[in-house]
Curated annotation (Swiss-Prot):
SUPFAM superfamilies referenced in this protein's UniProt entry, alphabetically: Nucleoside phosphorylase/phosphoribosyltransferase catalytic domain (SSF52418), Nucleoside phosphorylase/phosphoribosyltransferase N-terminal domain (SSF47648)
Catalytic activities: N-(5-phospho-beta-D-ribosyl)anthranilate + diphosphate = 5-phospho-alpha-D-ribose 1-diphosphate + anthranilate
GO BP: L-tryptophan biosynthetic process
Keyword Amino-acid biosynthesis: yes
Binding site for Mg(2+) 2: D224, E225
Function noted in UniProt: Catalyzes the transfer of the phosphoribosyl group of 5-phosphorylribose-1-pyrophosphate (PRPP) to anthranilate to yield N-(5'-phosphoribosyl)-anthranilate (PRA).
Name this polypeptide is given: Anthranilate phosphoribosyltransferase
Gene, per the UniProt record: trpD
Gene3D superfamilies from the UniProt entry: Nucleoside phosphorylase/phosphoribosyltransferase catalytic domain, Transferase, Pyrimidine Nucleoside Phosphorylase, Chain C
Binding site for Mg(2+) 1: S91, E225
Length: 336
């Protein structure tokens, strides 16, 4: 099927949902050669991925991952990467605040790809055991409303793609698929993207993948996060409908900063930044976490405004609930 699909793509023809899903199945099963995988990814990128092609590919990738079993609504806070901004780990830090606010967070991540420090890197530097089996992570999720799923543990089939992606050295559909293939089947999601043109299409993809409440965001300073230094373009998913709007820090009483104020560093440096924020240290980095946490809380709850959600996020940090959440997570991940 992958050869036929390449022929279609070279002729600028869109693939059907069924064909795109079958191709992903071939790739994830190890049935496609590196040459064919590279040709397919390049041809798809040159044509431009459709909503159906992305959705089908994500569904195909999910079929081949190890699942984390649970019985609750869970939130994923994630970015596609590729913004080349080298910010500190905003999404990961935000996860501790949001989960401490009572919203279960199932974070899915990897080591660094497009930055100096990925989610797995900073958590490891904080002392978290990232190598837990799915059953152990499920227990922690049940116990404290938070877990981390290391991509290499859950997506072993990616070994068939990794060498090709490294050699190609260009963005491919897999830059988008990682955040869409949460092993816990997250039905709540804040997804940051690396270009504005992806906001609406990926909101439609999340809707097709069964996300109940979600938000796709792009900071106009280039960040794949809700930005504290510029406007953020948003598309919100609620009750099967999409809503477009713009977010600005001033809406919740925060002051814009320079993009450089959010830059991080090595895993050890970013771990220190995360711990300082959760301990109550003030400044732009804390405000960026409050902004992103407020958006998550507001997105999930029906009974509050964005401003009230920001107050909740601030109180969670100032009351030390967020730092206690981090310390408890470290403790539970290392228990034997």
């Amino acid at each position: 099927m992958i050869k036929e699909a390449i022929y279609q793509l070279v002729n600028k023809e869109d693939l059907s949902y069924e064909v795109a899903e079958q191709v992903m199945d071939e790739i994830m099963s190890g049935e496609a050669s590196n040459v064919l995988i590279g040709s397919y990814l390049t041809a798809l990128r040159m044509k431009g991925e459709t909503i159906d092609e992305i959705t089908a590919s994500a569904a195909g990738m999910r079929k081949h991952c190890v699942r984390l079993l649970h019985n609750m609504d869970v939130l994923e806070i994630v970015g596609t990467g590729g913004d080349e901004a080298n910010t500190f780990n905003i999404s990961t830090t935000t996860g501790f605040v949001v989960s401490a606010a009572g919203i279960p967070v199932a974070k899915h991540g990897n080591r660094c790809v497009s930055s100096k420090c990925g989610a797995a890197d900073v958590l490891e530097a904080l002392g978290v055991n990232i190598m837990l089996a799915p059953l152990e992570s499920a227990k922690i999720l049940e116990e404290m409303g938070l877990c981390f799923m290391f991509a290499q543990t859950y997506h072993s089939a990616m070994k068939f793609v990794a060498p090709v992606r490294r050699e190609l050295g260009i963005r491919t559909i897999f830059n988008i698929l990682g955040p869409l293939a949460n092993p816990a089947g997250a039905n709540l999601e804040l997804l940051g993207v690396y270009e504005e043109a992806l906001v609406k299409p990926l909101a439609r993809v999340l809707l097709k993948l069964g996300v109940k409440r979600g938000m796709v965001v792009y900071g106009r300073d280039g960040l794949d996060e809700i930005s504290l230094s510029h406007q953020t373009v948003c598309c919100k998913i609620r009750d099967g409908k999409l809503y477009d709007y713009i977010l600005e820090p001033e809406q919740i009483g925060l002051t814009k900063c320079k993009k450089e104020d959010l830059v991080g560093g090595s895993p050890a440096e970013n771990a220190a930044i995360t711990r300082a924020i959760l301990n109550g240290e003030k400044g732009p980095k804390r405000d960026a976490v409050i902004f992103n946490a407020a958006a998550c809380i507001y997105m999930v709850r029906d009974d509050i405004t964005l401003q009230e959600a920001a107050k909740i996020a601030t109180d969670i940090i100032d009351s030390k609930k967020a730092i206690h959440q981090l310390d408890k997570f470290i403790e539970l991940s290392n228990r034997r």
